[in-house]
């Protein structure tokens, strides 16, 4: 079986780097050298150009805004993107990584307003739209240089030279085209609707923008319950001595009361009345308790009216308005019936302000309130929504003119009290939507906007969503699927300045209506209207105000007086980012074949909230334009927070500058921390400020990999070995070599499975970066702490034997393959090792291909080798645990270990060669196997009652009785039987019980492998003099080796050793184990004294062994 097609004869050559790094800052230095190597040798460019153009892997790099610095969320997204792109490149694909910039929209405008000292649309218009937009254009890339520095330093490869910008003419023209296509498909319309409105930004928001970045947060509102006086008594409700009938209404927005035009009741609610001072108050029966509680608390005398009040007796009754601003409105101030009114909160009666509530608007429009033609949008909006762009009342609300609506609540309540209309006020804590740009509470207001009719294509979007592989998988039917099911039409227009303009021209005379929509600048397609064709002027900038100056006579006006003028709105910047797949290529004007052949994208990733942002807008436009999902695979990663679960912010000072972390520890450590965490597929990462978690990655991941390389180079240099990559597993005969080779192949396959295997039936969805990272960590743990440690004596051998060369070749081979397969996840450190080991296959590891193991099938004996080795590693861990708990030194030999097997043939029939490895590793002389496990442990059975209740709920009492009487048995086939075979009994399924073992000896431990119980081991702790002396000899070897290291001796240096002690057991030990000690420590002489003149060892290095009253001296020869 061939691992590679050709035999690699590769000479190991050390390069200029120091191989003995100890601190994280050293790894940072290595990374900087590697970054320079990549740059000088154009490795990134070569990684693309070296791949076949016809074998592409497409991923979309979502455009960030460049008017702020990157944060940890950007870094996380970048790490995932770069890892997948590197992996697919090494899998043989061409992966273009074109970077993009989001240039338009509120972030740019808000920064410009702040720096220019202008605020609000009127101030901008006075300042000049041209000057304002030019400032936006020049400032939008303010931090692009810093972005490039961050991205480069995180070892992320992107193409900045061919980047796209949403403000580029080509990008904007593709957006025009897409709008035109939607218009032609009947998916665009203009309408007045209630929309979430940011008065701080003076613009409406999309409905999904109120659902991202935790836009909902707690807000305390002042509520009021007030009385509206009916002008007539309710039908069939004539009560003696009643002077007035009043309807109680509860509202959390007192500021909307000046704009009240109707009241709404429900046909599904029972109403009742209560009399106070000869006035009857009407409200829902569900509110009665609240009413009575308030009256008692405030000593208000009341009388409950007998019987219910039917909603029909209230319908269409007129009432006296609280304010007189709209007294002239026809059809207003009536009680209307509506299904949306509920009695969960409030009085079961709702006040209607059609300019500030969706239900209010729809109901009043249906009833002709106000009686204004929908075509006269300006008059209608001025009537029902009398506030300016900044959220202040206009002159129509004369008592509160120029006051912000939120600032009028107290005054309005005071007026209600003065008119004796206020029944009750309260503070109300509730979740309220805020502007995700400014953190200010939103207003819901009526506005005229342009919409994509998403509801028309909603069902198709739901169908296409089934074709997308979401990671984590629950996003498909959960967060994203539910969002699609409730999708609403999308308001895509913004009455702002810096953005792609809506390509819509309308007649300025409603008597001669006409609408023109354009889909291109020049005439390219016969069926698409072009701007230059109609306006007969060359166009090189689509931005305002230049585009607003394009005016022409209305062709449908025979008088020739009316003109076609552009609507002043610009696109929602989410429409622009959602157009990125085709707009970055200037489709369909250029790159038509390229786009159509490779759409949809293979992969995309952003944080999970983009299910209601970018992922959603991509999906809407892709479905509407191409009837396809926009991507095939999508990772929704989580959020990086501080250790208290709070967002990272400058105000809280709860995070470190990423660049400082990179400078101290390198970016590979931060990358691997994030990739190996659940944050890489939807969880949240709680990141400490001090870099402890990053240091842990250095210690637990990067150093083990580096130490493997370092170990090889040290001894290969000494022996001047020309190591080679082993090409055939069959040529490996050493059991440890065979094991680590098989483990390497198994690890590579597990990484491939994690990254590529898609099998929904078994829960595999590919792109499992965390699982791939875990496989890498586990392998290098085994390589360092098992293979290298177990094989050190082979490398230390003074002779260049075949076995020694085989060990070198084995270590070299697994490093070769593991460096390759780890490269996407640890790009810099693997590159450093690749360069240092001089594999001479490719100039860079990132230009090489992933290991080819398609033709490798591990034989049964290979699989068994792995199984046996994992078993003894597990047993070693159990023995070490007992030694630690019982304070028995690892170097102290013990006489015997007894293993009691529990239904495990591997444990009972462990081959002798594995027994020998086990005994040597745990420092025990002999091993005994037994099957009577009950002699040393007792079983404890625990039933899983929820699972049993699903299958045999009627037998639960019987099962409990049998369990209490301890009537159960493990059958020969491994099944568990509760009861006795001759009588009542039940065979339990694996998930219906747990079987534990309780050991009876303090020197015993259960043996498990994964979830499976294998048996029990017992350690014999009896010590003889011979065992004690051997332990002392091993301790002496350890302190000699430590002294060599402390004094910076080379591993090949020969030494003299002098021991001074009066301990008889130590002297006997040295005598008995002399050859062992000198061989292990490269000692040419070893002398022991009871007393010693210090002058005789003045040139020696001194150390002590206190527990044996021993002083040791060594000298390099």
Swiss-Prot record:
<keyword id="KW-0862">Zinc</keyword>
<keyword id="KW-0067">ATP-binding</keyword>
<comment type="similarity">
    <text>Belongs to the class-I aminoacyl-tRNA synthetase family. IleS type 2 subfamily.</text>
</comment>
<dbReference type="GO" id="GO:0005524">
    <property type="term" value="F:ATP binding"/>
</dbReference>
<keyword id="KW-0547">Nucleotide-binding</keyword>
<dbReference type="Pfam" id="PF00133">
    <property type="entry name" value="tRNA-synt_1"/>
</dbReference>
<keyword id="KW-0648">Protein biosynthesis</keyword>
<dbReference type="GO" id="GO:0008270">
    <property type="term" value="F:zinc ion binding"/>
</dbReference>
<dbReference type="GO" id="GO:0000049">
    <property type="term" value="F:tRNA binding"/>
</dbReference>
<dbReference type="GO" id="GO:0006428">
    <property type="term" value="P:isoleucyl-tRNA aminoacylation"/>
</dbReference>
<dbReference type="InterPro" id="IPR002300">
    <property type="entry name" value="aa-tRNA-synth_Ia"/>
</dbReference>
<dbReference type="GO" id="GO:0002161">
    <property type="term" value="F:aminoacyl-tRNA deacylase activity"/>
</dbReference>
<dbReference type="Pfam" id="PF19302">
    <property type="entry name" value="DUF5915"/>
</dbReference>
<keyword id="KW-0030">Aminoacyl-tRNA synthetase</keyword>
<keyword id="KW-0963">Cytoplasm</keyword>
<dbReference type="InterPro" id="IPR014729">
    <property type="entry name" value="Rossmann-like_a/b/a_fold"/>
</dbReference>
<dbReference type="InterPro" id="IPR023586">
    <property type="entry name" value="Ile-tRNA-ligase_type2"/>
</dbReference>
<dbReference type="InterPro" id="IPR002301">
    <property type="entry name" value="Ile-tRNA-ligase"/>
</dbReference>
<feature type="binding site">
    <location>
        <position position="650"/>
    </location>
    <ligand>
        <name>ATP</name>
    </ligand>
</feature>
<dbReference type="InterPro" id="IPR013155">
    <property type="entry name" value="M/V/L/I-tRNA-synth_anticd-bd"/>
</dbReference>
<dbReference type="Pfam" id="PF08264">
    <property type="entry name" value="Anticodon_1"/>
</dbReference>
<feature type="short sequence motif" description="'KMSKS' region">
    <location>
        <begin position="647"/>
        <end position="651"/>
    </location>
</feature>
<dbReference type="GO" id="GO:0005737">
    <property type="term" value="C:cytoplasm"/>
</dbReference>
<dbReference type="InterPro" id="IPR001412">
    <property type="entry name" value="aa-tRNA-synth_I_CS"/>
</dbReference>
<dbReference type="InterPro" id="IPR033709">
    <property type="entry name" value="Anticodon_Ile_ABEc"/>
</dbReference>
<comment type="subunit">
    <text>Monomer.</text>
</comment>
<comment type="function">
    <text>Catalyzes the attachment of isoleucine to tRNA(Ile). As IleRS can inadvertently accommodate and process structurally similar amino acids such as valine, to avoid such errors it has two additional distinct tRNA(Ile)-dependent editing activities. One activity is designated as 'pretransfer' editing and involves the hydrolysis of activated Val-AMP. The other activity is designated 'posttransfer' editing and involves deacylation of mischarged Val-tRNA(Ile).</text>
</comment>
<keyword id="KW-0436">Ligase</keyword>
<protein>
    <recommendedName>
        <fullName>Isoleucine--tRNA ligase</fullName>
        <ecNumber>6.1.1.5</ecNumber>
    </recommendedName>
</protein>
<dbReference type="GO" id="GO:0004822">
    <property type="term" value="F:isoleucine-tRNA ligase activity"/>
</dbReference>
<dbReference type="InterPro" id="IPR009008">
    <property type="entry name" value="Val/Leu/Ile-tRNA-synth_edit"/>
</dbReference>
<keyword id="KW-0479">Metal-binding</keyword>
<dbReference type="InterPro" id="IPR009080">
    <property type="entry name" value="tRNAsynth_Ia_anticodon-bd"/>
</dbReference>
<feature type="short sequence motif" description="'HIGH' region">
    <location>
        <begin position="64"/>
        <end position="74"/>
    </location>
</feature>
């Amino acid at each position: 079986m061939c691992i590679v097609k050709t035999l690699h004869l590769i000479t190991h050559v050390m390069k200029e780097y120091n191989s003995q790094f100890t601190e994280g800052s050293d790894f940072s230095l290595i990374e900087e050298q590697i970054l320079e190597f990549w740059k000088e040798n154009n490795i990134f460019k070569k990684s693309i150009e070296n791949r076949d153009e016809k074998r592409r892997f497409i991923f979309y790099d979502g455009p960030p805004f460049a008017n702020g610095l990157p944060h940890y969320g950007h870094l996380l997204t970048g790490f995932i993107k770069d890892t997948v792109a590197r992996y697919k490149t090494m899998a043989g694909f061409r992966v273009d990584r074109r970077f993009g910039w989001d240039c338009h929209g509120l972030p740019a405008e808000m920064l410009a307003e702040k720096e220019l000292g202008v605020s609000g649309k009127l101030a901008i218009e006075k300042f000049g739209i041209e000057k304002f937009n030019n400032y936006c254009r020049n400032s939008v890339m303010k931090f692009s240089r810093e972005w490039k520095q961050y991205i480069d330093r995180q070892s992320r490869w992107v193409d900045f030279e061919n980047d796209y910008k949403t403000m580029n003419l080509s990008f904007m023209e593709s957006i025009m085209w897409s709008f035109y296509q939607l218009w032609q498909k009947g998916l665009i319309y203009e309408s007045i609707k209630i929309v979430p409105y940011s008065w701080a930004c003076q613009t409406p928001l999309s409905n999904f923008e109120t659902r991202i970045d935790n836009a909902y947060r707690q807000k305390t509102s002042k509520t009021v319950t007030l009385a509206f006086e009916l002008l007539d008594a309710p039908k069939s409700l004539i009560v003696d001595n009643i002077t007035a009938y009043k309807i109680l209404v509860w509202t959390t927005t007192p500021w909307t009361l000046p704009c009240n035009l109707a009241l709404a009741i429900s046909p599904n609610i029972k109403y009742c009345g209560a009399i106070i001072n000869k006035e009857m108050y009407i409200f829902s029966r569900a509110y009665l308790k609240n009413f009575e509680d308030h009256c008692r608390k405030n000593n208000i005398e009341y009388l409950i009216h007998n019987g219910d009040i039917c909603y029909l007796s209230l319908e269409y009754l007129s009432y006296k308005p609280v304010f007189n601003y709209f007294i002239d409105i026809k059809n207003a101030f009536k009680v209307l019936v509506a299904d949306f009114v509920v009695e969960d909160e409030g009085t079961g009666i709702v006040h209607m302000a059609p300019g500030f509530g969706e239900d209010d608007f729809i109901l009043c429009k249906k009833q002709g309130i106000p009686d204004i033609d929908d075509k006269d949008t300006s008059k209608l909006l001025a009537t029902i929504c009398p506030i300016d762009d900044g959220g202040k009342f206009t002159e129509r609300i004369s008592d509160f003119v120029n006051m912000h609506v939120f600032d009028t609540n107290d005054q309005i309540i005071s007026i209600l009290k003065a008119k004796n209309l206020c029944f009750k006020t309260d503070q109300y804590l509730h979740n309220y939507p805020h502007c995700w740009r400014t953190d200010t509470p939103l207003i819901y207001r009526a506005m005229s906007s342009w919409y994509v009719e998403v509801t028309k294509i909603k069902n198709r979007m739901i169908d296409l969503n089934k074709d997308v592989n979401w990671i984590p998988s629950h996003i498909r039917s959960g967060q994203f699927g539910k969002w699609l099911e409730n999708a609403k039409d999308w308001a895509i227009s913004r009455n702002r300045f810096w953005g792609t303009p809506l390509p819509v021209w309308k007649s300025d005379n409603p008597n001669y209506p006409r609408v023109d929509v354009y889909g291109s600048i020049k005439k390219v397609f016969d069926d698409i209207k072009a701007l230059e064709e109609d306006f007969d002027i060359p166009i090189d900038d689509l931005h305002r105000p230049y585009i607003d100056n394009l005016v022409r006579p209305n062709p449908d006006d025979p008088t020739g007086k009316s003109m076609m003028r552009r609507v002043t709105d610009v696109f929602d910047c989410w429409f622009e980012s959602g157009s990125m797949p085709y707009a970055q290529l200037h489709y369909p004007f250029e790159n038509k074949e390229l786009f159509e052949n490779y759409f949809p994208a293979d992969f995309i990733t952003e944080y999970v909230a983009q299910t209601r942002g970018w992922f959603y807008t991509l999906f809407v436009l892709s479905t509407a334009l191409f009837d396809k999902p926009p991507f095939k695979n999508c990772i929704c990663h989580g959020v990086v927070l501080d250790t208290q679960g709070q967002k990272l912010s400058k105000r809280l000072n709860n995070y470190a500058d990423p660049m400082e972390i990179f400078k101290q520890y390198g970016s590979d450590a931060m990358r691997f921390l994030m990739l190996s965490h659940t944050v890489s597929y939807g969880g949240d990462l709680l990141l400490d400020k001090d870099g402890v978690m990053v240091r842990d990655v250095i210690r637990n991941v990067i150093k083990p990999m580096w130490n493997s390389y370092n170990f090889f180079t040290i001894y290969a240099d000494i022996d001047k070995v020309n190591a080679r990559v082993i090409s055939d597993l069959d040529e490996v005969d050493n059991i440890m070599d065979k094991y680590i080779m098989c483990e390497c192949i198994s690890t590579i396959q597990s990484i491939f499975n994690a990254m590529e295997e898609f099998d929904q039936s078994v829960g595999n969805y590919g792109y499992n970066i965390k699982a791939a990272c875990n496989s890498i960590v586990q392998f290098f743990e085994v390589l360092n702490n098992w293979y290298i440690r177990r094989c050190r004596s082979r490398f230390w051998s003074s002779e260049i034997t075949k076995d020694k060369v085989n060990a070198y070749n084995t270590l070299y081979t697994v490093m070769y393959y593991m460096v390759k397969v780890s490269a996407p996840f640890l790009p810099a450190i693997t590159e450093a090792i690749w360069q240092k080991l001089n594999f001479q296959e490719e100039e860079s590891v990132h230009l090489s291909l992933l290991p080819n193991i398609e033709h490798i099938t591990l034989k049964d004996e290979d699989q068994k080798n792995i199984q046996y080795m994992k078993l003894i590693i597990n047993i070693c861990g159990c023995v070490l645990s007992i030694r630690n708990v019982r304070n028995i030194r690892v170097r102290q030999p013990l006489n015997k270990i007894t293993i009691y097997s529990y239904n495990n043939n591997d444990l009972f029939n462990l081959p002798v060669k594995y027994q020998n490895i086990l005994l040597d590793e745990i420092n025990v002389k002999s091993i005994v196997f037994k099957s009577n496990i009950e002699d040393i442990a007792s079983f404890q059975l625990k039933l899983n009652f929820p699972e049993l209740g699903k299958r045999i709920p009627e037998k639960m009492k019987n099962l409990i009785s049998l369990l209490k009487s301890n009537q159960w048995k493990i059958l020969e086939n491994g099944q568990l039987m509760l009861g006795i075979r001759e009588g009542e009994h039940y065979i339990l399924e694996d998930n219906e019980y747990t079987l534990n073992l309780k050991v009876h000896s303090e020197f015993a431990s259960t043996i498990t492998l994964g979830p499976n119980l294998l048996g029990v081991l017992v350690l014999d702790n009896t010590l003889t003099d011979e065992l004690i002396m051997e332990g002392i000899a091993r301790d002496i070897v350890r302190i000699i080796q430590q002294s060599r290291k402390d004094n910076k001796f080379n591993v090949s240096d020969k030494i003299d050793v002098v021991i001074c002690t009066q301990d008889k057991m130590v002297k006997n030990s040295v005598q008995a184990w002399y050859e062992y000690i000198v061989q292990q420590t490269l000692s040419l002489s070893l002398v022991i004294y009871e007393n010693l003149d210090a002058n005789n060892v003045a040139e020696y290095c001194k150390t002590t062994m206190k527990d044996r009253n021993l002083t040791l001296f060594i000298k390099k020869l």
